[in-house]
UniProtKB/Swiss-Prot annotation:
Protein name: 3-phosphoshikimate 1-carboxyvinyltransferase
Oligomeric and partner information: Monomer.
Origin: domain of life: Bacteria
Subcellular location: Cytoplasm
GO molecular function, one term: 3-phosphoshikimate 1-carboxyvinyltransferase activity
Length: 445
């Protein structure tokens, strides 16, 4: 099981204007998928811009344990020589994913289609998170959990199917992790595996499967949903992948630039996939100055340069159907809402309760301890913005990287400094967050 070092607290203080040009790390979702699909392909895959955070490095390690050759060839440059669909070897060691729910759940899907048995584990936070929603459809395809902690949680042993069965599966919630696990298992099944979702979730797996040569067709389902049909047993071919900057990581310097007076900050190569840009849409509705140029793409994923300038924000209502496109960004959106004038209502946030922490309660606690009026009603978060934040609070991060970064952003414009109890877990997704923000003008001490 993963362990962490002693806590490393940090104080964030009111800063002068943020400026310059920065590139946030490569997208975490793309990085995980590039490693996994590279490992399931025949031949070599070259990846540039890979996120070298702990979560992704644990996925790289798991691919090595399962028989793929994974090497770092330069800064953020990696090669993967795969074993082909269904070719994973029996692992000699536990697959430890640390804090990464995405890596763990996607690899469960990939393992489910192979006739091997693997032990999955993670840190205390990941051990507390639900896995049943992933394991249920994989069981329909022939995989079996032969041992697990109470409630199907980690650590658990997954026996992959000798003869995986294609299924048609309707996801109970909008979840790219559930969808992706089923599709990755479906690669090894004969015939067509279909996933139906009522609300479209991020489509990185579908786009990358096409990039590696899979036959996959996506059609509309209802007013907001999608039907994804994958033809199994393809021969995936290694392909080059350029990883764009992660919009979920870009969210932190972006919101910081909006709330710190006089800021004018440029973020380069940010992914602008429409299923990941709910935060940008919401902030623009609040009055944010966010401009895009240098628009281009790779492997089906669009990216652009963003110019962000300090803005006077107003409260808005965020509809629940927007949640899948910004599920990881509500924490830092709540910070923006605290600096806005008026009330912001974020609806339908039930999925925040089963992230690295109960992010709904943790977000409310982060705001309250710093003098912001906030209320949770059911699955809705209501923030009363007053144009400024008193600050002065100590924020409990609960081993959650996004809580830590959101609180540090909040302190950059608050009346009194904001302190986080531990910054260690920031390394899971954004290892250079603190030096990169300092370079732009942030005052962390």
């Amino acid at each position: 099981m993963s362990t962490s070092a002693a806590p490393t607290p940090l104080e964030s203080r009111a800063s002068g204007p943020l400026s310059g040009t920065i590139r946030v790390p490569g997208d975490k979702s793309i990085s995980h998928r590039a490693l996994i699909l590279g490992a399931l392909s025949v031949g070599g895959t070259r990846i540039s811009g890979l996120l070298e955070g702990e979560d992704v490095l644990n996925t790289a390690k798991s691919m090595r344990t399962l028989g793929a050759k994974v090497e770092r060839t330069g800064e953020f440059a990696w090669t993967v020589n795969g074993v082909g669909v269904g070719g994973f070897a029996q692992p000699a060691a536990t697959l430890d994913f640390g804090n990464s729910g995405t890596g763990c759940r996607l690899v469960m899907g990939a393992v489910a289609g192979c006739p091997i048995s693997a032990v999955f584990d993670g840190d205390a936070s990941l051990r507390s998170r639900p896995m049943r929603r992933i394991l249920d459809p994989l069981a329909l395809m022939g995989a079996k959990v032969t041992a697990s902690a109470e409630g199907g949680k980690l650590p658990l042993t997954l026996q992959g199917a000798s003869n995986p069965v294609p299924i048609e599966y309707r996801t109970p919630v909008a979840s790219a992790q559930i969808k992706s696990a089923v599709l990755l298992a479906g690669l090894a099944a004969p015939g067509v595996t279909t996933v139906i979702e009522q609300e479209a979730s991020r489509d990185h797996t579908e786009l990358m499967l096409k990039h590696f040569g899979a036959e996959i067709v996506t059609t509309p389902e209802g007013s907001h949903g999608r039907r994804i049909a994958l033809t199994g047993q393809p021969e995936l071919r290694g392909a080059p992948v350029i990883v764009p900057a992660d919009p979920s990581s870009a969210a932190f310097p972006l919101v910081a630039a909006l709330i710190v007076d006089g800021s004018d900050l440029v973020l380069s190569d940010v992914m602008t996939n429409p299923l990941r840009t709910g935060l940008f849409t919401t902030l623009r509705e609040m009055g944010a100055s966010i401009e895009e140029d240098d628009v281009r793409g790779d492997a089906g994923e669009p990216m652009a340069r963003l110019r962000v300038r300090a803005s006077k924000l107003k409260g808005v209502e965020v509809p629940p159907e927007r949640a899948p496109s910004m599920i990881d960004e509500y924490l830092v959106l709540a910070v923006a809402a605290a600096y806005a004038e008026g009330t912001t209502i974020m609806r339908g946030l039930h999925e925040l309760r089963v992230k690295e922490s109960d992010r709904l309660e943790a977000t409310a606690a982060m705001l309250r301890v710093n003098g912001v009026k906030v209320e949770i009603t059911g699955d809705d978060l209501i923030v009363e913005g007053r144009g400024h934040v008193p600050g002065g609070g100590l924020v409990a991060t609960h081993m959650d990287h996004r809580i830590a970064m959101s609180a540090l952003v909040m302190g950059l414009a608050s009346d009194k400094p904001v302190t986080v109890d531990d910054t260690a877990f920031i390394a899971t997704s954004f290892p250079d967050f603190i030096p990169l923000m300092r370079k732009a003008g942030a005052d962390f001490a």
